Amino acid sequence: MDIKFEGNDAECTAGLKKASEGSFVLKDHVLIEFKINGKVAGKIKTPCEGVVTFGKGLKPGIVLNKGQVIATVSECTHAIVIKDMCATCGKDLREKGGRAGQRKEQSTANVSMIHHVPELIVSDTLAKEIGSADENNLITNRKLVLLVDLDQTIIHTSDKPMTVDTENHKDITKYNLHSRVYTTKLRPHTTEFLNKMSNMYEMHIVTYGQRQYAHRIAQILDPDARLFEQRILSRDELFSAQHKTNNLKALFPCGDNLVVIIDDRSDVWMYSEALIQIKPYRFFKEVGDINAPKNSKEQMPVQIEDDAHEDKVLEEIERVLTNIHDKYYEKHDLRGSEEVLLDVKEVIKEERHKVLDGCVIVFSGIVPMGEKLERTDIYRLCTQFGAVIVPDVTDDVTHVVGARYGTQKVYQANRLNKFVVTVQWVYACVEKWLKADENLFQLTKESTPPVGRPLGSKYVNDLANMDTIGKAALADMNNEVDEALSDDEDDGDNEDEDDDGNDVGEDKGDENLEEKQEKNEEEMDDVEQNGSVENQSGDALENETDSTSRGQKRKHCPEMEDEEEESDSDNEDDDTPMSYKALLSDSRKKGRIVPENEDDAVFDVDDEKGHAPANIDEEEDDEDNEDEEVPESDDDDEFEDMAALIERQISDAVDEKDQ
């Protein structure tokens, strides 16, 4: 509803406003006074309740004309809401008995702009007004925005019990939080880095640590609240448990054109072009990022880094960020004031691309087999920093990045006088944003594969350095496997029985004989009545031997038990060993691993036909048991001795009855 000035015969001027712009007023609330000859002559009141919006150009002292719109009173749109209560009109928007967010009335507020007060949300229109004012303020002060991660970027925190002399180590702080003792170590050069960056950047903390933890670290880094103030975004305010990018639109509703990020991990920022990824800082032994999101790729370090005290990463990053700031405002000054605001990501991309510009790189043994080159981090890093990746060594290639010496690509590169370097050369270029000296990272016969993943690369040492297998070696392996598969299936059973020694085997045999003797004595009564003692004993022995043989086969291959019970003839068809190619194909289909060394090749196969070669992984145990292995002939002798013993026992029993 528009409120207009009714006019007066005399000249009237506007007095002081009695309400603020955008405020909620009740009916008959005084909006403004008007004067005649410098004295208050009347007041203009609201005919209803609502939100006040004053007319343009209305200010004290101006002449009021009849019919002029003084203000507009409209219904509250609830543009500012905190905990489901409108901050403008004070109305409770939550349903009775409802949970947070369950409102009985619609609201235009949906943007959370305050770092540490996520419950305070504003409308899109108001958010853009605030964001635009913030941008103008930054440009006026010639600053950019810097989002700073905490853990393993500028600090390292441990929750392990330890004794630390904090008096002699001023950069180490111990404190209690959530009934636990934490120890935090500042990365070398952190204080100087933050102080210098504050002159060029408006700094914000963005961390996966909890709110109390984040604010406690901020007190350590910025005790006067001068660098970060209250611009602290913790896990409690983040919209996603896996990514930090979702909050950027809320924090910067007009766009992230001025935002630069430093973090030790790129995945949580979805590999944003605004990210300056830095080497993780690890000081405490066997402690990674205690606040890393679940299911993340973060890996625990095995040892404390020897150069933890000599870390100079922040000095390099300070140089990079200073250069980005200067380049941005150089380009900004050349643009017209009416043009769209320059995006700092364009400057970052351009400066990053200069590092390896002109480099044509071939990888040798770096990318694991079966993985697409374009999806690896080593490929992403090289291309981001300006290199071109090609598959083969040609005259245009400048570098071969290899994992081991002696490959064909390395040989070709040496023959063409190309740089042959280790993967550490790439990491050194990425970490410092400078092209490193190739002579310091030459790949030689003495070079060792890299340990760890400095910038989160998916470089897999074990798979990437598998030795190649020649045709002769494959032929030898084929023969060895065929011979192993052609051995009698009972060999494996003999090894299992003889592992405990011959004495144990004899004891078990005696126990079995006693049981059989008792059984045969019971059968003797029946046999004697039928008058066929000898035939019955022979049949019992034959059944016993056949049952023992079937038991051995079932023990060797349990999954064939049911089939063998149904038909013994099926086993005769299954005795044909698998060929080497079929065996290898079956192993690959079932996900079994073929190791890199020929001598250590393991084919852990237990196929449907019951063929199971000896496990070479247990080579040491097999060597110990070689002397105790029982040959096949011993099995036959054992059965013959057993049969003879049973016959003698039966014969003695018959003689005793006759007597």
Swiss-Prot record:
Region of interest (Disordered), residue spans: 484-640
InterPro entries per UniProt: BRCT_dom, BRCT_dom_sf, Fcp1, FCP1_dom, FCP1_euk, HAD-like_sf, HAD_sf
Keywords: Differentiation, Hydrolase, Nucleus, Oogenesis, Protein phosphatase
BRCT domain ranges (all copies): 351-443
Organism: Caenorhabditis elegans
Role according to the record: During the late stages of oogenesis, dephosphorylates 'Ser-5' of the heptad repeats YSPTSPS in the C-terminal domain of the largest RNA polymerase II subunit ama-1. Similarly, dephosphorylates 'Ser-5' of ama-1 in early embryonic cells prior to the activation of the zygotic transcription program at the 4-cell embryonic stage. May dephosphorylate 'Ser-2' of the ama-1 heptad repeats YSPTSPS in embryonic somatic and germline cells.
EC code(s) of this entry: 3.1.3.16
Name the UniProt record assigns to this protein: RNA polymerase II subunit A C-terminal domain phosphatase
Top-level taxonomic group: Eukaryota
